[in-house]
From Swiss-Prot:
The gene is aroE. Homodimer. This is Shikimate dehydrogenase (NADP(+)). Involved in the biosynthesis of the chorismate, which leads to the biosynthesis of aromatic amino acids. Catalyzes the reversible NADPH linked reduction of 3-dehydroshikimate (DHSA) to yield shikimate (SA). NADP(+) binds at residues 78, 126-130, 150-155, 214, 236. Belongs to the shikimate dehydrogenase family. One of its GO terms (biological process) is shikimate metabolic process. SUPFAM superfamilies: Aminoacid dehydrogenase-like, N-terminal domain (SSF53223), NAD(P)-binding Rossmann-fold domains (SSF51735). Signal peptide: none annotated. Its EC number is 1.1.1.25. CDD domains: NAD_bind_Shikimate_DH. InterPro entries: Aminoacid_DH-like_N_sf (IPR046346), NAD(P)-bd_dom_sf (IPR036291), SDH_C (IPR041121), Shikimate_DH (IPR011342), Shikimate_DH-bd_N (IPR013708), Shikimate_DH_fam (IPR022893), Shikm_DH/Glu-tRNA_Rdtase (IPR006151). The active site is at 66 (proton acceptor).
Length: 262
C-alpha cells in the first residue's frame, strides 16, 4: 500500500508541498502519495485525527493551524517548543510528535548560497511567528547577535524575553522599524510590509552585506531596495524547499540534497 502524507491548511490551493515531496521521492526511489487537505477553521484537529486513523504517516501544517498543531502534540522537539508552532506531525509509539522545520529550512537555504552565518550579526524585520520560528536554528548555526526590529518595540521585547533563556549563546536586541540603523552581515525580512504595499524603508543608516526575503514569487520593495545597493539578495523559495526537505528526512530517514531542487 502506498504511503500517505498530506499538507493541511486554509487556504491550501497555493501549497507547493505535494510537488516538492513527490520530487524528493522520485529522486530517492520512494513510493508515496502526498495530498492537499483543506480543513475548516474549526476542523483542524478532526482532520488530523481522521488522516492518521486512516493510516496516514505524516502531515505538514500551514497557515493558520501551526499553533493548534503545537497544542495537540504529546511530544515536541526543542525547536518546536521554542517556536511554539508545529509544521510537521507524525505518530510514534501511539503518540503525536511535532517539529518545526521552518528555521532549519532557512539556515539550509542560506548555507546553500554560501552566505556566512558563523559569527555573524543579523537583523530580522518583524517579531511575529515567522521570526520566532527561525531564531533558535540561526543561533545553532553560529549566529552571535540577532537584532529584531518591529513597528511596536514592545512586541519585539516580549519575543526577546521569551527566547532569552533558550538561546543564551547569542545576544538578542530590539529596535523599531522606523529607527533602523547599524552594520549587519544579513538582513531578513519576516514582515508582510514590503508585499502589502506598505512603505518599508531601508535608510542609509542601515548597512548590510546580504538580504533575504522570506516571501517568494511576489514583488518586494525590500528586495528592490537591497538590489539597488548592489548587495546579494534572494527570496524565500529556498527556505520553502529546505523546510520540506527537513520534514521529508524526519519521515523517511533520508535527506534529499537541497541544491538539486532550487
Amino acid at each position: 500500500m502506498t504511503k500517505q502524507f498530506a499538507v493541511i491548511g486554509n487556504p491550501i490551493e497555493q501549497s507547493r508541498s505535494p510537488e516538492l515531496h513527490h520530487a524528493f521521492a522520485e529522486k530517492l526511489g520512494i513510493e508515496l502519495n502526498y495530498s492537499k487537505r483543506l480543513a475548516p477553521l474549526d476542523g483542524f484537529e478532526a482532520n488530523v485525527k481522521t488522516f492518521f486513523d486512516q493510516g496516514g504517516l505524516g502531515i505538514n501544517v500551514t497557515v493558520p493551524f501551526k499553533e493548534q498543531a503545537f497544542a495537540m502534540c504529546h511530544q515536541l522537539t526543542e525547536r518546536a517548543k521554542i517556536a511554539k508552532a508545529v509544521n510537521t506531525l507524525w505518530i510514534e509509539n501511539g503518540q503525536l510528535h511535532g517539529d518545526n522545520t521552518d528555521g532549519q529550512g532557512l539556515v539550509d537555504a542560506i548555507q546553500a548560497l554560501n552566505w556566512p552565518l558563523q559569527g555573524t550579526r543579523i537583523l530580522i524585520l518583524g517579531a511575529g511567528g515567522a521570526t520566532r520560528g527561525v531564531i533558535y536554528p540561526l543561533v545553532q548555526a553560529g549566529v552571535t547577535e540577532i537584532v529584531i526590529a518591529n513597528r511596536t518595540q514592545q512586541r519585539a521585547e516580549q519575543l526577546v524575553q521569551d527566547l532569552a533563556g533558550s538561546v543564551s549563546e547569542a545576544t538578542l536586541r530590539v529596535m523599531t522599524l522606523d529607527q533602523l540603523h547599524g552594520n549587519f552581515d544579513l538582513v531578513i525580512n519576516a514582515t508582510s510590509a514590503s508585499l502589502s504595499g506598505d512603505a518599508l524603508v531601508l535608510p542609509e543608516t542601515l548597512q548590510f552585506k546580504y538580504a533575504y526575503e522570506m516571501a517568494y514569487g511576489k514583488p518586494s520593495s525590500f528586495l528592490d531596495q537591497a538590489k539597488a545597493r548592489g548587495v546579494p539578495t534572494t527570496e524565500g523559495f529556498g527556505m520553502l524547499v529546505g523546510q520540506a526537505i527537513e520534514a521529508f528526512s524526519i519521515w523517511h530517514g533520508v535527506k534529499p540534497n537541497l541544491t538539486d531542487f532550487l
